[in-house]
């Protein structure tokens, strides 16, 4: 039987796309709006956010320490659902005119990913449905992707494969609870 988003789930299960959207209805609205505006499939957006922030709106990169005790600051400026860097987020706000967009907003983060992935498609030819290669370009930047910088990073290639697999899994799951 088809499960609707209104079905009750006992707890938020981040391995189940329908559970995620049922527990956070505003996520579905954000992902759907991004899909309509930019063409990025909902399951691709969800898979990237899962690996970038585990759906935590204020996610930050880990702290770095000198001698294991003296804090040196964060690994990068990445923040929020999409783990967007300060400079890239500023570029997004300027390019889209969304000057008050916040990285801690699922709506703004999903829109950012749509904007970024659309740029990736234009610059690299990577399909918006190709979660694995979109993730590689998302992580390395479009120029880094074109140069193949990820090829020397087996851990990143493995992670991108996981993003692709999770995207496929989410796509299958979503077919039972929403019309895509």
Where are these regions (language model features)?
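Short amphipathic alpha-helix starts
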Residues: 1-2, 26
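Short, small-residue-biased leader/transition segments that mark boundaries at the very start
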Residues: 2-9
